[in-house]
Amino acid sequence: MLDRCDRVQVAVIDRHKAAEGYRRIFGAETAREDSSRHLGAKRLILALGESEIELCEPDGAGRVGDHLAKWGESLMTAGYSTVDVAALERRLDQLGVTTAREGEQLYFGPPHTPGVPFVISPSTYRPRVGRASFLYETTNTLVSDWRTAAAIYSGLFGLDPSRFSKIGSHRFAYEGTLTLFDPPNRLDRIELSQVTGPDSAMGRFTARRGDSLYMAYVEVHDWPGVHAALMDSKSRWTPRGKDAATERDGGWVHPKELGGLLLGVSRTTVAWEWSGRKHLVAAPR
């Protein structure tokens, strides 16, 4: 029932300051500003490619303030879209999942998910803004068995396990699967990464938080522009290869640059290399 990974919500101290990195690196632009009683927040919503980044600054007591008090500035909510939010709400209700509605958005999360809070929005067309194309992934880091998590998400969202693609990394010490929604047409998925090494970055993260929401991924159609912005501004990031100056495929932007969001970046099609369809990867321009 899920269509796309269309947004993330990030808990920040100052929404306008947090927006600076997205503008500088990706050419993101303000889509709108509003407030959320459900979150207890003022929101600055950025257009990032076809997707949106909700920068949530506390506005009195509420979920955003609680998140900041416990974890500091960081990724708070994984956002996906569906063509029929009401139908998904009915499905979740039948499964005994506690949900909350605010406007067009549907919220739910633990204990019904393996540590990830979700916000579901209606699928809609948006023009691309800036150097990014779209978000396509949020990462659920796990101490528990990734197979159990995959079964949970399949049940909640009606996903087809035959479309999933198994993953693993010695470099980052995890194993798991990508719950691809519509391959090979789109990359959208939830990544399930079960930690295999306690000394890895994911291992240290899950030691503090357990099963949890870790990061997001964006595809960019203008990697040279993103790369130049990263290098020229001396932003903190890690290249996918060995040399930042000559990196051609992407990397990871440090949370300090993006108001607490660890954001993976990949040039057009390169993510298919680890998504089960290497033949779809086009050479860099």
For each feature predicted by the language model, list its residue ranges.
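Amphipathic alpha-helical segments
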Residues: D14-E29, L88-L95, D145-P161, V226-K234
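An N-terminus-focused feature that recognizes amino-terminal "leader" regions
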Residues: M1-G62
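Serine-centered coil/turn micro-motif
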Residues: A61-G65, D199-S200, V270-W272
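N-terminal beta-strand motif that seeds the catalytic metal site of vicinal oxygen chelate
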Residues: M1-A19, E73-Y80, S121-F157, S162, ...
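N-terminal strand-loop-strand beta-hairpin
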Residues: T30-L48, Y107-H112, K166-F181
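Vicinal oxygen chelate
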Residues: R4-I13, L44-G49, E54, V64-D145, A173-Q194, ...
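Aromatic-anchored, glycine/proline-accented short structural segments
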Residues: W146-T196
